[in-house]
Design a protein with these regions (language model features):
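Short glycine-aromatic motifs
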Residues: 32, 37-38, 77-80, 103-104, ...
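Solvent-exposed, low-complexity, repeat-rich "mucin-like" stalks and linkers
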Residues: 25-69, 116-155, 203
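Sec-dependent N-terminal signal peptides of Gram-positive bacterial secreted proteins and lipoproteins
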Residues: 3-24
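Enriched for extracellular/lumenal, surface-exposed ectodomains of secreted and cell-surface proteins
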Residues: 42-43, 60-66, 84-85, 90-112, ...
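Conserved aromatic beta-strand anchor motif in extracellular beta-sandwich/beta-rich domains
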Residues: 158-160
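Serine/threonine-rich, repeat-prone extracellular segments and beta-strand-based repeat modules
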Residues: 67-105, 164-186
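Short, solvent-exposed mixed-charge patches
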Residues: 206-207
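Interdomain linker/hinge connecting the two RecA-like lobes of the SF2 helicase core
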Residues: 151-155, 180-182, 196-197
Length: 207
């Protein structure tokens, strides 16, 4: 009999607790989703490759709630920041992910770019000086001709405007019997992962 009374008492306590638990669950607010309601402002959207890691800071993250009110969120309290790649050094596009925490859920992204750098330090060393055609009447001659200051291990090609002279392996060779005239050598530095292409035209004069 005593055991029966204890059992009834336990059942009554459980029955009283169920509505309270349900009410607490109902009253607990659901997390607000950042998707479609969030604006991210980065300190910078574009960089130029400089062989160093480059990341923008997150200036502001604002959220528009159901009432239409815009709220400024706090990093660490309302969201965390992460980048799509561990290394942010090379040229390319990078994503910045804002992930909700605390009262907020979901995630939104923004992006920024690192542009290729220009080949600013390319110089063409040309030891050839304007020479009279009669100098090449009996035989051709070679002179130093090469591009220096090229970055990023870019491939360099030289294109001559005439078959009467050649540019190869850092030398320009004017062939025997070359005529008077103005010739050109086009120096092309190919683009690489982090550097844009570069082109320069050098004039060769035979008097």
């Amino acid at each position: 009999m005593k055991n029966l009374k204890k059992l009834i008492a336990i059942i009554m306590v459980i029955a009283l607790m169920i509505p309270c638990t349900a009410m607490a669950a109902t009253e607990s607010p659901s997390k607000a989703s950042l998707k479609g309601n969030t604006t991210i402002v980065l300190s910078k959207k574009s960089f130029t490759f400089n062989n160093k890691s480059q990341k923008p800071s997150v200036k502001t993250v604002t959220y528009k709630n159901a009432d239409g009110k815009t709220v400024t969120l706090k990093e660490g309290t309302d969201y965390t920041v992460s980048f799509s790649k561990k290394s942010t050094k090379n040229a390319g596009t990078y994503k910045v992910t804002i992930k909700g925490t605390g009262k907020y859920s979901g995630s939104v992204t923004s992006s920024y770019t690192i542009k290729k750098a220009k080949q600013k330090n390319v110089k063409v060393t040309n030891k050839y000086k304007a020479t009279k055609a009669k100098t090449f009447k009996k035989k051709g001659k070679s002179y130093t001709f090469k591009a220096t200051g090229v970055k990023g291990k870019a491939k360099v090609t030289y294109t001559a405007s005439s078959k009467k002279f050649k540019v190869k392996n850092g030398k320009i060779t004017l062939s025997k019997g070359i005529k008077k005239g103005t010739y050109k050598v086009t120096v092309k530095v190919a683009k690489t992962k982090n550097y844009s292409a570069y082109t320069k035209t050098v004039t060769i004069k035979v008097k």
